[in-house]
Amino acid sequence: MKKKIIITGGLGYIGTELCKLYSGVSWHHNITVIDNRFISERVNQIRNWNMDFIQGDILNKDLVNKYIKDADIVHHLAGVTDVPRTKNESSTIQDEKIKEVGEKGTQNILDVISDKCKIIFPSTHVVYEGISEVKTDIKEDEDTKPVLSYSSSKAVNENQLKKSGKNYIILRLGSVYGYSSDSMRIDIMPNLFSKIASQNGTLKLFAGGRQIKSLVPLIDVARCCLLYTSDAADEDDSVD
């Protein structure tokens, strides 16, 4: 049976890879990509894959109501990705934008989707960034302790989903890395290290290189997002 599938933030790092995976089945479903940017090469490719593209913002309630209201599946990937990594990098304007897009945008979607719609939301491992003890195996029921605006907004999003009564899946992702033919996040550690090494540069490690970093390949994240669209997948769940 044809399903109506929405991908918000579909021109982004994860969204681009997810669209590629959907390209093999896009003639069997009604797939719409929503993004507030217009990147002509990616938009043309999406349309060639028989997907619709809508340039718009999830803060626009009328747009959300028009295109998302009767969705069967929503991959909610939209959000601000240019975020501060330390308190010194933070600014009030940037923090407010992260909060507005993340929290108001998510609520706009939750307000219009049906209880039968499955919403798949990528959260982040940095919701644990305030934990002082170094842990290598954090369980899903561990209390979150966000510090910066990005992780704080994601923690709020998780609570929005849990209280919504909707059919949701939360994926607490590690730092997503890897090459995509359409996009490349050079600000991500493994990608940056690969670039430096390919140019015979020097990698500088501080604190003796003892830091622990959670990493997950881009393609695995996209596959996971697709996997959880299955009717057999767990519902109302958080997965680390």
Predicted feature residues:
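N-terminal Rossmann NAD(P)H-binding glycine-rich loop of SDR-like oxidoreductase domains
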Residues: 7-23
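NAD(P)H-binding glycine-rich loop region in Rossmannoid oxidoreductase-like domains
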Residues: 58-100
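Conserved Rossmann-fold NAD(P)-dependent oxidoreductase catalytic core, especially the SDR/UDP-sugar
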Residues: 107-147
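Active-site helix of classical SDR
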Residues: 153
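NAD(P)-dependent short-chain dehydrogenase/reductase
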Residues: 159-213, 218-222
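Single conserved hydrophobic/aromatic residue that forms the stacking wall/gate
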Residues: 228-240
